[in-house]
Swiss-Prot record:
The active site is at D58. Pseudouridylate synthase responsible for the pseudouridine-2819 formation in mitochondrial 21S rRNA. May modulate the efficiency or the fidelity of the mitochondrial translation machinery. It comes from Candida albicans (strain SC5314 / ATCC MYA-2876) (Yeast). This is 21S rRNA pseudouridine(2819) synthase. CDD domains: PseudoU_synth_RluA_like. One of its GO terms (biological process) is enzyme-directed rRNA pseudouridine synthesis. Its EC number is 5.4.99.43. Disulfide bonds: none annotated. It catalyses: uridine(2819) in 21S rRNA = pseudouridine(2819) in 21S rRNA. One of its GO terms (cellular component) is mitochondrion. The gene is PUS5. Its main location: mitochondrion. Keywords: Isomerase, Mitochondrion, rRNA processing. Belongs to the pseudouridine synthase RluA family.
């Protein structure tokens, strides 16, 4: 499983993550180890301790994210999530949902509150507290790209598949996955068990393998726009892994 290094600077790295890689250094097959391996091919002296996760993608979600290389830049990214400082990050995703009918309104804002367990998997044997968070997601459905897919897996037999573009205003845990269900009454493609496992203390090994050959979810971080001190950079991320492209 390969992590694509899109850009590297003294302050940050931009990467394209495959499905199955974890954004948590305490787990095996994690993004920090993979990023360190890529860097050491160019800079052998690089140590994994310099990398700081300021964005996270769920294990079975693909696409781009920014990783800070020092505390100053990490703080800068975190401030941007609260509209503070000089840095602005725009994060856009593309997802797939199965909808029999196209809603009258094909774009808008989802602002339902979401519930999530406290962010600490190290205490698996201890019940974690449940919190309610405010959350805001902007969306746009693409009716012209709606298709009925003839695939061998049950995940393609749930109805016509409709692409949706999503932009985060807040960055809560599982925000997009939660908001899709609340807004449309259906999950993202191959995310049918989300409502069951999101409040479990342990991370499940198998999420939706009965519907598809892997646990990959039809959600991809496709675009990151970074604006810093008047300079704007856009990073467009394809689904690079051929194995991951089959769901799309």
């Amino acid at each position: 499983m390969k992590l694509d290094l899109v850009k590297r600077t003294f302050n940050y790295a931009v990467v394209n993550k495959p499905s199955g890689m974890v954004c948590d250094a305490s787990h095996t097959n994690n993004i920090i180890t993979a990023l360190t391996n890529e860097f050491t091919k160019i800079l052998p002296s690089v140590n994994s301790s310099q990398f700081r996760l300021v964005q996270r993608l769920d294990r079975f979600v693909t696409g781009g994210l920014v990783v800070a290389r020092n505390k100053k830049w990490a703080d800068k990214v975190r401030k941007s999530f609260f509209q503070e400082g000089t840095l602005r990050l725009t994060r856009r995703y593309v997802g797939l949902i199965a909808l029999d009918q196209i809603p009258e309104s094909t774009q808008g804002t989802i602002d339902f509150p979401i519930q999530a367990l406290e962010k600490d998997y190290r205490g698996k044997n201890k019940s974690r507290e449940l919190f309610t968070y405010s959350a805001v997601t902007h969306y746009k459905l693409i009716p012209s790209a709606r298709r009925t897919i003839k695939g061998v897996f049950p995940v393609f037999q749930q109805g016509p598949i409709l692409p949706i573009i999503l932009e985060l205003e807040t960055g809560r845990k599982n925000q997009i996955r939660d908001h899709i269900i609340q807004k449309f009454g259906v999950p993202l493609l191959n995310d049918d068990n989300f409502s069951d496992f999101k409040l479990n203390s342990e991370i499940p090994k198998d999420v939706n393998s009965k519907l598809y050959k892997s646990n990959q979810i039809a959600l991809h971080s496709g675009l990151v726009i970074m604006e810093n001190n008047g300079i704007s950079q856009q990073f467009l991320f394809p689904v690079n892994n051929a194995y991951d492209r089959e769901l799309w």
